[in-house]
């Protein structure tokens, strides 16, 4: 099922890009904070609002908006060992604001929008990539079509959180990969889109996000326990932001970039569970939003994104070593 995205929401989502501003946020950053960033070979096609995931030691960047502000079906794969990008089979349709995750060695792209020029259509599609055949196939559709959602992999399941159709949602649906079946579970306490999510130590963490482009930005951290179908509140981020990326590495969670109205972020934060606090790490060299993050061999890759509020697709490929 597809539903047309309201024109008012679409206009709000792109308003910042129409202003043509490039203003970095005053987010708390410390250039001397621990961690090291390195720039690697850029993507062939600059894109933002991308879906990003790691599979087989490589980084996949799927869909998004190009510099022409039109959605694309492009899929590029980055090999950190050779510092080379290559194109693989495109998505079945152009998609932006989708989310991606790998569950039990299988790569899925979930939801998003298709269409451009303010004529966005919400999607409930689920596509699985088969690397041995270099093909995509459709799977059981998500019950609630939405874009700007986040997904997290945990225990053989994919958790789809939040997003928006005509407004921000607190919808929470779970995909059982083996059964190819969706179910609804306890919704998030806070309705939001453009959030990030990770599976971490048996829980699903929902991080940041926003009510709308010009509305409330959230620092909220909400933690879901699948065993009890319950939520609890975690320590909030140091700064409220939507359009951020997140990754779990070892016993830490990292968040990167994002935007607030008319501002973009370079801030990197790390959750240290030993002190139950988010601490500043070295900021991204290039402030961006509409990004994703993927972990390969102890490093976190953050490709693409927008350099300005709204539209400003970048081909940047930066890697963080904690």
How does the language model describe each region?
Residues 19-322:
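Kelch-like beta-propeller repeat domains
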Residues 1-8:
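Bacterial N-terminal signal peptides that target proteins for export
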Residues 8-16:
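Bacterial N-terminal signal peptides
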């Amino acid at each position: 099922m597809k539903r047309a995205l309201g024109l008012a929401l679409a206009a709000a989502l792109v308003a910042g890009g129409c202003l043509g501003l490039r203003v970095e946020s005053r987010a708390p950053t410390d250039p001397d904070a621990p961690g090291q960033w390195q720039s690697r070979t850029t993507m062939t096609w600059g894109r933002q609002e991308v879906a990003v995931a790691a599979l087989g030691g490589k980084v996949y960047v799927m869909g998004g908006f190009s510099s022409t502000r039109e959605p694309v079906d492009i899929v590029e794969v980055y090999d950190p060992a050779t510092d080379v990008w290559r194109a693989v089979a495109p998505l079945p349709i152009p998609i932006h604001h989708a989310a991606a995750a790998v569950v039990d060695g299988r790569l899925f792209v979930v939801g998003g929008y298709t269409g451009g020029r303010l004529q966005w259509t919400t999607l409930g599609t689920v596509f699985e990539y088969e690397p041995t055949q270099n093909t995509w196939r459709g799977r059981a559709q998500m019950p609630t079509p939405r874009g700007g959602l986040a997904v997290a992999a945990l225990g053989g399941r994919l958790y789809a959180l939040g997003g928006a159709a005509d407004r921000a949602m607190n919808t929470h649906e779970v995909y059982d990969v083996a059964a190819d079946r969706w179910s609804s579970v306890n919704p998030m306490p806070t309705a939001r889109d453009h959030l990030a999510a990770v599976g971490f130590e048996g829980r699903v963490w929902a991080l940041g996000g926003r009510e709308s482009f010009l509305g409330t930005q959230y620092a909220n951290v909400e933690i879901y326990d699948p065993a009890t179908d319950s939520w609890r509140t975690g320590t909030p981020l140091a700064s409220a932001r939507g359009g951020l990326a997140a990754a779990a590495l070892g016993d830490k969670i990292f968040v990167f970039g994002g935007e607030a109205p008319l501002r973009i972020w370079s801030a990197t934060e790390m959750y240290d569970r030993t002190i139950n606090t988010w601490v500043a790490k070295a900021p991204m060299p290039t402030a961006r939003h509409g990004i994703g993050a993927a972990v390969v061999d102890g490093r976190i890759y953050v490709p693409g994104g927008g350099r300005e509020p709204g539209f400003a697709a970048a081909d940047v490929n930066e890697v963080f070593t904690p």
